[in-house]
């Protein structure tokens, strides 16, 4: 059946049926519908509840597809189109007016009206100007920034009408537009719809009220899914007096727009790159805005969701910083022993019971080693514990007999005075270099120790220098040390001709392992056997570095588990969010959002939650590091840009990975089911 032709055929249904499966039953809601709508008509589809009128409207608006038969929109068949093409049809050619308005509560009236234009890629300033123009012309100029909760029912429905017109609204589909309004507001809405019809819009009103249907020029009655009447209205209603809406949008015919619709993606692709990036940026900006609004609406839930991410990121960053700090501390301790050094001891290894009886390490060995080209410096070493005295002060300390190159080998700095020389060693001079701890104990009142004579046991020695304090993890920093020429210690104190150890510093350009083999070979030849062992500081360094890295990795893996738990929490909350915002998803799809737009919005929300959690986690870790430094002066957590950047990358990945399933679920929603969700 057809009504009076007012323009070209716009919408046509042939033998259209729609069935739904409920349990094991198949329910036919529409049965062999044949209907043609022309451009510029004002049609009312009227019927009781369950007659199929809303299902018919959903098919007309490309929200649903027929189970059988065919539906044409200006020559195109929607049921054969993909979801993006259907979204484009809804976005560019249809405007929906719902009984319950379906406005987004977190957006203002203007922002609600702008939504279809966002998905159409319209410039921000242009769509804002258009939204203001539309709202002003329907009497809401003073309420542009009002939220839906601040508007009356009639005002909310006007906002819904403005939203339907945002992209042109060639076909206005109004589902019970006055059902939730009082009589006065309902008449205002009907007058607006009639005025839009006079401007050339095709208006389809779905209602159960025949008095509402009487305002249309053509009435189609449905009963039990079939058209039982299709009659024109021969007498025209009075021209509406409530509002006058000049053509607020330059509307080409739908036939013209549809004919070029297939070329739209190509045209977009041909736009300048800057323009395409601007459109994409605009969509991302709006998605970020909606994500922030959604997070702000559920502050406590958002905070609890982020808690797992905060703890996980803080744990990972802190563990890495602790590992880095401990590694640097250990390396500093090893460097305190001297860089690129070899320590030569009698015996086979530490703890060798026979080492005390081996007296083959001699000062001549040190002299021969010093002549090797790959060796930078050498110092023999002997030591003993004695009582140190000056005046009436006496303390226990260690006397170290060393060579003149000892301070160079060990990397010590002379803070006061000077170190002894080769002449001091050769002449068995009774000269001493003390450390700062010894100076503070024997000369507590700031008296200069230089030139003073102290007793090392029973041996008097003149202080010629003070060595600066040096941190070392191998022995207490509070030890009292005195250094004298090793010849003086051996002859005047110990009465021995053998050494406790020899320390060798290798040239920086020489591989320490090769130098170690050279030393072993040389001394073995001199001794006739290998009755000594060599401690390579680089080997210790590498072992400690490997151990530290392994422990850091192990603890990091434990921290990563908390990140995964946090990610699962994000996914859980995002699923809840998708369920709570089902109607919003339906509205966005109805006004033209593609599946990718919906997915993008929820992915951005998940990533934003994780990034914010990651930022707070990094801040928490830095705070822990600050507190740590306040209570520990000898050790600090070392943060690196790489670890912080990695933390943010991990946060983003968690958002993408654990937000993907909820976002996909949202994108795959049926718009009809979403709109019907209470």
Curated annotation (Swiss-Prot):
Pfam families with a match to the protein in the record: ABC_tran, FtsX, MacB_PCD
Tell me the SMART domains matching this sequence. Answer: AAA (SM00382)
Subcellular location as annotated? Cell inner membrane
What superkingdom heads the lineage?
Answer: Bacteria
Task: Answer whether the UniProt record assigns the keyword Transcription regulation to this protein.
Answer: no
Statement: the UniProt record of this protein carries the keyword Transmembrane helix:
yes
Q: Which PROSITE patterns match?
A: ABC_TRANSPORTER_1 (PS00211), ABC_TRANSPORTER_2 (PS50893), MACB (PS51267)
For biological process, the GO terms are: response to antibiotic
Entry's Gene Ontology molecular function annotations: ATP binding; ATP hydrolysis activity; transmembrane transporter activity
ABC transporter domain boundaries: 11-249
Q: Where does ATP bind?
A: 47-54
Q: What is its EC number?
A: 7.6.2.-
Q: Which InterPro entries match?
A: AAA+_ATPase (IPR003593), ABC3_permease_C (IPR003838), ABC_transporter-like_ATP-bd (IPR003439), ABC_transporter-like_CS (IPR017871), MacB-like_ATP-bd (IPR017911), MacB_PCD (IPR025857), Macrolide_Exporter_MacB (IPR050250), P-loop_NTPase (IPR027417)
Alphabetized, the UniProt keywords read: Antibiotic resistance, ATP-binding, Cell inner membrane, Cell membrane, Membrane, Nucleotide-binding, Translocase, Transmembrane, Transmembrane helix, Transport
Gene Ontology CC: plasma membrane
The first-level EC class reads: translocase
Q: Which family does it belong to?
A: Belongs to the ABC transporter superfamily. Macrolide exporter (TC 3.A.1.122) family.
Q: How does it assemble?
A: Homodimer. Part of the tripartite efflux system MacAB-TolC, which is composed of an inner membrane transporter, MacB, a periplasmic membrane fusion protein, MacA, and an outer membrane component, TolC. The complex forms a large protein conduit and can translocate molecules across both the inner and outer membranes. Interacts with MacA.
Give a short account of what the protein does.
Answer: Part of the tripartite efflux system MacAB-TolC. MacB is a non-canonical ABC transporter that contains transmembrane domains (TMD), which form a pore in the inner membrane, and an ATP-binding domain (NBD), which is responsible for energy generation. Confers resistance against macrolides.
Q: Which PANTHER family match?
A: MACROLIDE EXPORT ATP-BINDING_PERMEASE PROTEIN MACB, MEMBRANE COMPONENT OF TRANSPORTER-RELATED
Its protein name is: Macrolide export ATP-binding/permease protein MacB 2
Q: Which organism is it from?
A: Yersinia pseudotuberculosis serotype I (strain IP32953)
């Amino acid at each position: 059946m057809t009504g009076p032709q007012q323009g070209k055929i716009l919408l046509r249904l042939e033998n259209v049926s729609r069935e739904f499966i409920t349990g094991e039953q198949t329910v036919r809601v529409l049965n062999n519908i044949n209907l043609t709508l022309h451009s510029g008509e004002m049609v009312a589809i009227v019927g009781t509840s369950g007659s199929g009128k809303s299902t018919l409207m959903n098919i007309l608006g490309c929200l649903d597809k027929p189970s059988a038969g065919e539906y044409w929109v200006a020559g195109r068949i929607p049921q054969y189109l993909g979801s993006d093409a259907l979204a484009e049809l809804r976005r560019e050619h249809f405007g929906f007016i719902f009984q319950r308005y379906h406005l987004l509560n977190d957006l203002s009236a203007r922002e609600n009206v702008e939504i279809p234009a966002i998905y159409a890629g319209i410039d921000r300033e242009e769509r804002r100007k258009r939204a203001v123009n539309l709202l002003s012309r329907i009497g809401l100029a003073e309420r542009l920034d009002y939220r839906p909760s601040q508007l009356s029912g009639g005002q909310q429905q006007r906002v819904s009408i403005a939203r339907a017109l945002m992209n042109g609204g060639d076909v206005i589909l109004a589902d019970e537009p006055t059902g939730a309004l009082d009589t006065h507001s309902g008449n205002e809405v009907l007058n607006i719809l009639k005025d839009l019809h006079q401007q050339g819009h095709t208006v389809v009103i779905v209602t159960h009220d025949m008095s509402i249907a009487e305002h249309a020029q053509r009435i189609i009655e449905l009963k039990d899914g079939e058209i039982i009447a299709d009659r024109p209205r021969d007498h025209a209603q009075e021209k509406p007096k409530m509002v006058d809406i000049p053509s607020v949008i330059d509307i080409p015919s739908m036939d013209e727009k549809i004919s070029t619709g297939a070329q739209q993606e190509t045209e977009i692709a041909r736009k300048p790159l800057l323009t395409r990036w601007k459109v994409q940026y605009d969509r991302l900006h709006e998605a970020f805005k909606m994500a922030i609004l959604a997070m702000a609406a559920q502050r406590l839930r958002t905070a609890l969701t982020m808690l797992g991410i905060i703890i996980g990121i803080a744990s990972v960053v802190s563990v890495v910083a602790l590992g880095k700090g401990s590694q640097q501390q250990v390396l500093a301790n090893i460097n305190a022993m001297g860089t690129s050094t070899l320590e030569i001891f009698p015996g086979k290894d530490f703890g060798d019971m026979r080492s005390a009886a081996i007296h083959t390490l001699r000062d001549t060995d040190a002299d021969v080693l010093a002549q090797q080209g790959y060796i930078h410096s050498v110092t023999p070493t002997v030591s003993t514990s004695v009582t140190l005295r000056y005046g009436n002060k006496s303390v226990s300390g260690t006397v170290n007999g060393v060579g003149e190159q000892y301070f160079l080998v060990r990397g010590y700095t002379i803070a006061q005075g000077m170190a002894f020389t080769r002449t001091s060693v050769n002449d068995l001079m009774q000269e001493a270099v003390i450390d700062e701890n010894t100076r503070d104990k024997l000369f507590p009142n700031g008296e200069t120790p230089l030139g003073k004579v102290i007793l090392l046991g029973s041996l008097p020695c003149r202080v010629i220098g003070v060595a600066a304090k040096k941190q070392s993890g191998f022995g207490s920093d509070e030890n009292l040390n005195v250094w004298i020429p090793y010849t003086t210690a051996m002859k005047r104190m110990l009465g021995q001709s053998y050494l406790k150890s020899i320390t060798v510093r290798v040239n920086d350009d020489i591989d320490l392992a090769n130098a170690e083999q050279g030393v072993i070979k040389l001394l073995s030849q001199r001794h006739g056997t290998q009755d000594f062992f060599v401690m390579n500081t680089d080997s210790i360094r590498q072992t400690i570095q490997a151990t530290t890295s392994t422990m850091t990795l192990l603890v990091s893996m434990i921290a990563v588990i908390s990140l995964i738990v946090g990610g699962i929490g994000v996914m859980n909350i995002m699923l809840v969010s998708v369920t709570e915002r089902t109607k919003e998803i339906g509205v966005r799809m109805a006004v033209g959002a593609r599946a990718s737009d919906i997915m993008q919005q929820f992915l951005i929300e998940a990533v934003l939650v994780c990034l914010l959690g990651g930022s707070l986690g990094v801040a928490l870790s830095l705070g822990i590091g600050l507190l740590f430094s306040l209570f520990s002066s000898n050790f600090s957590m070392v943060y690196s840009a790489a670890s912080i950047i990695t933390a943010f990358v991990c946060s983003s990945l968690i958002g993408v990975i654990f937000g993907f399933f909820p976002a996909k679920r949202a994108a795959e929603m049926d718009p009809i089911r979403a709109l019907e969700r209470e």
